[in-house]
């Protein structure tokens, strides 16, 4: 049966090749649109959904990681335990950023999709895997963008906020992050474009 089906499909492909070979360029384009136009539109829609959702999730991850990386260490007020925990968390986040920025997305996709099933016995669907992989990858890139955006804000503004009694969280939300967000907007657009192209992986 398989041989019959394969021969049948082979005959269909041969007939299509013969038909297409006798067409000029524009006729071929029109023929492909008529035959596969619905598939192209479906694929484009899937690409946009994955890229938009994953970029949004990746930005959220990037903001969280970037903010944690820029938390200052208060040597006088912070307890020893808090210093140790913060240092360990920063090291883990730095490893995450370096690994996901330094390896190709195809390698990450293979490791997460197949590795999760083999190591943790977790079976993920294609959509779940796509969102997870692109989001985590985007988060690593956005983390550095957020960190750079926060650092680029004049340190005098942080000192001024602390001088009037603002906590670190208040300083970030009211003074630093609004300016940092404006600085990293172009990078968010760049990551969206990259994700649109990288969904082919």
Ranges and model annotations:
Residues 1-13:
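Single conserved hydrophobic/aromatic residue that forms the stacking wall/gate
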Residues 11-201:
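Transmembrane alpha-helices and adjacent helix-loop boundaries
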């Amino acid at each position: 049966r398989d041989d019959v089906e394969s021969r049948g499909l082979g005959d269909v492909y041969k007939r299509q090749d013969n038909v297409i070979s006798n067409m000029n360029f524009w006729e071929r384009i029109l023929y492909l649109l008529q035959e596969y136009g619905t598939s192209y539109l479906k694929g484009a829609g899937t690409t946009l959904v994955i890229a938009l959702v994953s970029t949004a999730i990746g930005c959220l991850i990037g903001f969280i990681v970037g903010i944690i990386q820029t938390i200052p260490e208060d040597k006088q007020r912070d307890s020893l335990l808090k210093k140790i925990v913060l240092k360990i968390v920063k090291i883990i986040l730095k490893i995450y950023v370096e690994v996901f920025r330094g390896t190709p997305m195809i390698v990450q996709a293979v490791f997460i999709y197949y590795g999760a099933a083999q190591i943790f016995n977790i079976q993920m669907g294609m959509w779940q895997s796509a969102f997870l992989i692109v989001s985590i990858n985007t988060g690593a890139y956005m983390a550095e963008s957020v960190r750079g955006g926060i650092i680029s804000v004049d340190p005098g503004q942080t000192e001024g906020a602390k001088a009037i009694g603002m906590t670190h969280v208040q300083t970030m939300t009211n003074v630093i992050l609004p300016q940092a967000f404006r600085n990293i907007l172009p990078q968010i657009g760049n990551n969206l474009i990259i994700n649109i192209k990288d969904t082919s992986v």
